[in-house]
């Protein structure tokens, strides 16, 4: 399958297509930045008045286990899945500040800032185009 060069230029400035070709930022630094951004989602929930895990899970429309994983930054190193992000964004009572943090995370992940593969970036970019804030 041919490489989509316009995607490459947007996702990886300079046309880098793999972790080996990307700038000197280490994978560990990228994952640390990703974990920090995910923690901001939890902080936004607390700032919106959702202190208890049950309340947080309810407003995100996720299971308690998934919510705990997000809040405590115990997620796998690949970050939040497109499915989880979709469920959170479709939550009817999601506070605007939390929604904004999720969109920030999606934008940064789609830009390749967290060291994801091209395939994962394409998936997140598709989610971004479907759910972009106006």
Could you tell me what each predicted segment is?
Residues 1-25, 126, 132-134:
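Glycine- and charge-rich intrinsically disordered segments
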Residues 13-14, 18-30, 98-109:
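N-terminal acidic-hydrophobic amphipathic loop/helix motif that frequently occurs adjacent to catalytic
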Residues 18-49:
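A short, Lys/Arg-rich alpha-helix, primarily the initiator
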Residues 52-53:
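Helix-turn-helix DNA-binding elements, focusing on the entry/boundary residues of the two helices
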Residues 56-57:
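Short alpha-helical "recognition helix" segments of helix-turn-helix
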Residues 61-79:
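Recognition helix of helix-turn-helix/homeodomain-like DNA-binding domains
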Residues 79-104:
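DNA major-groove recognition helix of helix-turn-helix/homeodomain DNA-binding modules
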Residues 97-134:
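Helix-turn-helix/homeodomain-like alpha-helical modules used for DNA recognition
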């Amino acid at each position: 399958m041919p490489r989509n060069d316009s995607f490459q230029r947007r996702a990886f400035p300079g046309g880098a297509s793999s972790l080996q070709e990307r700038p000197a930022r280490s994978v560990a630094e990228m994952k640390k930045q990703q974990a920090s951004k995910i923690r901001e989602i939890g902080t936004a929930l607390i700032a919106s008045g959702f202190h208890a895990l049950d309340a947080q899970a309810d407003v995100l429309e996720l299971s308690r286990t998934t919510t705990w994983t997000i809040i405590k930054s115990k997620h796998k190193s690949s970050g939040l899945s497109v499915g989880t992000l979709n469920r959170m964004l479709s939550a009817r009572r999601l506070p605007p500040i939390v929604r904004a943090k999720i969109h920030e995370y999606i934008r940064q992940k789609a830009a390749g800032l967290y060291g994801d593969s091209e395939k994962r970036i394409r998936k997140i970019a598709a989610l971004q185009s479907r759910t972009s804030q106006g």
